[in-house]
Every structure is written in structure tokens, then in C-alpha cells.
């Protein structure tokens, strides 16, 4: 079964019904890793590995997320300072918090995601995850009124929240490749 079908099946099983799907590519830096935040040059490119998410507003102030790759589930609130329990959900939490902080709208949602971007291999699986969710939230809760360039900043911030490391802007700029899919 393909990734998309697995996501659709789990979403229907866990939350009932369906929602729109979004996809974002992983990336490589053709001239080496870690050069961006060390003041060096970058030459990034998208790859054929992706993160895909099915997501739907749930009419609450809670975010409920299932990760097929991590075999896990997490939930957190939007109105209180309740952090997720899992490391991977911190990226989604960071996106939500930063969009709200910058004046955007975020409501509760249910989501299931999976991907084939290798984790820990320098192909930006976390950036692809952030990109998917930032694009989906912009579409579902802000009518795509947040410009792609502006959306790059909220997508960069979760790295600061999680790893106390400033994300480089170029890593975030490739997020403009994220899109709604059918």
C-alpha cells in the first residue's frame, strides 16, 4: 500500500471521514551540511522524498496528531502552554505557536502524517514536516493570506524551540515547494 493510501486509511480509522492532503519535499545541500548557520554558502535542492499529511479542522482548541513513521500519537492545546509529549510533535507545536504569535489564525485540528525522507541523514525531514504543517495551517485557517516568504519564519522557529539552534533562512525558503495535493 502506498504512503498516501496508508495515511488516508489511518485518518478515516482514527478521526473518521477525510481531509485535504499536503506534501513537502526533503532537500539536500549540494555543497555540504552545516554551512548555513556557520556563515557559509548554500546550494540547496529538493529531492524526490517527501512528507505527506492529511489534516482537518476539528472545531476545538486541541491538536491531535498521528505519526505513522514514529508509531505514535500526540495531542496538545492551543490556548494553554501545554507542550506535546513527543519530540516530533514539538515541530508542529512550534509552527502553531509561531503563527499565532505573528498574528495568524490556528484552530484545533486532527492530522495523520508519514514520509519517506530519511531522518538524521541531512535531508531535512523535520523541515519538510514543518513545511507541510505551515502550508496546511495557512490554507485551512488563514485562507493562504500569509505570504510564502512570511511563512518561512514561523517554519524556522520550531528548530529554535526544540534544539536551541537558529534555523537558517535558506532552509526555510525551500518550504515554498510545499503544496496541497489530491
Predicted regions and their residues:
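ATP-binding N-lobe of GHMP and related small-molecule kinases
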Residues: 2-127, 131-148, 154-157, 162, ...
Amino acid at each position: 500500500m502506498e504512503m498516501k493510501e496508508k495515511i488516508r486509511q489511518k485518518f478515516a480509522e482514527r478521526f473518521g471521514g477525510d481531509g485535504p492532503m499536503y506534501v513537502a519535499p526533503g532537500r539536500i545541500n549540494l555543497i555540504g551540511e552545516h554551512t548555513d548557520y556557520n556563515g557559509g554558502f548554500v546550494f540547496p535542492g529538493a529531492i524526490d522524498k517527501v512528507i505527506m499529511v492529511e489534516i482537518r479542522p476539528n472545531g476545538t482548541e486541541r491538536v491531535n496528531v498521528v505519526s505513522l513513521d514514529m508509531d505514535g500519537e500526540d495531542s496538545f492545546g492551543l490556548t494553554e502552554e501545554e507542550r506535546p509529549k513527543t519530540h516530533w510533535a514539538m515541530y508542529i507545536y512550534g509552527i502553531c505557536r509561531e503563527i499565532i504569535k505573528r498574528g495568524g489564525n490556528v484552530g484545533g485540528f486532527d492530522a495523520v502524517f508519514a514520509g519517506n525522507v530519511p531522518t538524521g541523514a541531512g535531508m531535512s525531514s523535520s523541515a519538510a514536516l514543518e513545511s507541510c504543517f505551515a502550508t496546511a495551517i495557512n490554507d485551512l485557517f488563514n485562507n493562504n493570506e500569509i505570504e510564502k516568504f512570511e511563512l518561512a519564519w514561523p517554519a524556522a522557529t520550531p528548530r529554535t524551540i526544540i534544539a536551541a539552534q537558529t534555523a537558517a533562512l535558506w532552509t526555510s525558503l525551500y518550504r515554498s515547494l510545499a503544496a496541497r495535493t489530491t
